[in-house]
Amino acid sequence: MAKDEAFCFYYRDNLRMLEHYGAELVFFSPLHDEKLPENIHGLLLGGGYPELYAKQLEENESMRKSIKEALEQQLPSLAECGGFMYLHDTLTDREGTTYQMAGVIPAECQYMGKLVRFGYVEVQLPQGLTEKGTAERPEPEKIKAHEFHYFDSTANGEDCIATKPVTGRSWKCIHASDDHFWGFPHLYYPSDPKFVKWFLERTEKHI
């Protein structure tokens, strides 16, 4: 679990739920550590302010390489907002300076000069993501989330649908597969415990 000055935003309820279902949280710093911790079975890149530390993140080439190699080997991973930004090829800050990031997502993330997304949303998960091999359910599975960012991506993902609860306005978002879930929304795990169980099951299979 990334935790330092650049990656510091996590809902406490989310961490409690991970631990409740048996996860052991191992902390590391994409800013200060040389590589990922040994013998981990999953990766959590939370929100924060990578744009304020983009130069230091770029300079830590060994960590960027460590994360890219781990995800290329299908280490189960969750990345939200700042963590999602870090996975891009590049990040361009508000001064227009472009920095190299982890290079996992072949896309650019850049400051837009205005608030891109703000507020609560419900994220509809891909059919069967958390229950592989089951019959189609009548109601799509959803998890509550929140977005607040001035940056945008040239590849926001199209595997989920985010919907505003009041207006009903919706848009595609998030890169999701059997081993990763990356996007701008900050998910609230207690709204869908099945999602947490799904991720932890993936980490167990990676042992």
Give the location of each predicted region.
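Short coil/turn connectors at secondary-structure junctions
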Residues: 21-23, 39-40, 73-74, 98-100, ...
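Alpha-helix N-cap/helix-start motif
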Residues: 11, 36, 95-98, 192-193
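Structured core elements
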Residues: 1, 26-27, 44, 79, ...
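Phosphate-binding active sites in nucleotide-utilizing proteins
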Residues: 6-59, 65-70
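Cysteine-nucleophile active-site neighborhood
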Residues: 50-129
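Amide-donor transfer/coupling interface in amidating biosynthetic enzymes
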Residues: 1, 15, 111-207
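Short, glycine-/Ser/Thr-/acidic-enriched flexible segments
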Residues: 4-7, 32-33, 49-51, 84-85, ...
